[in-house]
Every structure is written in structure tokens, then in C-alpha cells.
Amino acid sequence: MGTAAVGDYWNHNTAYHPWLVGIAAEHRGDVLDVGCGDGLLAERLAPVSRSVTGIEPDPATADRAVERVTDLDDVQISRTSFEEFDPGTRRFDLVTFVASLHHMDLRTSLARARDMLAPSGEIAVVGLWANGSAWDWVWSACCLPAVMVGDRLHRDTPDIGVTIAEPRESLRAIRRTTAEVLPGAVIRRKLYYRYLLRWSS
């Protein structure tokens, strides 16, 4: 697996970084980025946040994140899994997951994120789903031309040298579980085989 150098790049996940930065800017508070990877999102969140904490369980990837944010005083990287992360008494104004939620148990992780929110805090997810219905496959096929254009236009960097996993849950299953844990959450099917989830406490 290759290792991308520290710097900006574009792929199907970073395509939605502006959406997340926009939400963070509404709060100007404390952000928890779960599965922060090489720290690019944490770096981008820093200018609009009081503090950013990134969680990354893979040691080598966490080291890259630390290198990226080393000059940012209000960004910390924790080398741990979300399951083992202990926030103490801290509560967050925004908890983000970018292509990380499908690495974990969906129900448990959403509930844990919910319980770490400050009053009026939010959860924002850029997630992946597994095609589980005919409509899922039709949607994916119809999006392919736009995806190919986007990849070429933005010079897609699909492999940045981080651990990946195939999604297990269908979007229908994700919607069902999310509705039980985060009533009123909004989930939208988007380009690049991603969905966006947003919920306010």
C-alpha cells in the first residue's frame, strides 16, 4: 500500500470536506474527528474550530496525522480506536465520521457519538453503504458517468495509504438503525458512492 505525502489531495471522501467545514463553522467549537486518517480534515477544521481532536487507531496513519498538524496548537491526534477513546468530562460540539463508521459497529458508534455531544451538538457522517437493493445498483450505475468526470477533473487520489474496509450495511439498514439511535437524523444519498448523515442533539 502506498503512502501519500503530506499535502492536499482530492478523492471521494475529501469531496465532502467543505460540507463538514461548513457545519464546524456554524459551531466554532470543539470537534471530534473519528477515524481521522492522515489528518487532512482535522487540518481543515482547525481554522473554524476552538479545538479539534482526531482519533486514529492505525499507528502509522496516526503518525502521518501528527506530522500534518504538528504546527497547529489546537489540534490533537489520539492513537486509539473510538471504542477505547476516553473523553473524560469533555463534550464536543461536532463529531465527524468520514469513511470510518463502516469500520465499526453502527449502532454502538452512533450511540457513543451521541453521548459525547455538548448541548446543541451535532453528528455529521460521510459514509459508505453496500448495495442491497435494485435501486442501489441503479443509482450507482447512473452516477458512474458523473463520478468518472469528477475523478478526472479533480485528479482523484484514491489510495492515500490508509486502512480501508468494504461497507456491510445497505443504506436501508443504515437508515433504520440511525432512526432508532438518532431520531430525526437526515440521511442523503450522494455522488461518489457516499451518503451524508446529519443529526442535532
Region spans (language model):
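A conserved beta-strand element that flanks and buttresses the S-adenosyl-L-methionine
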Residues: 96
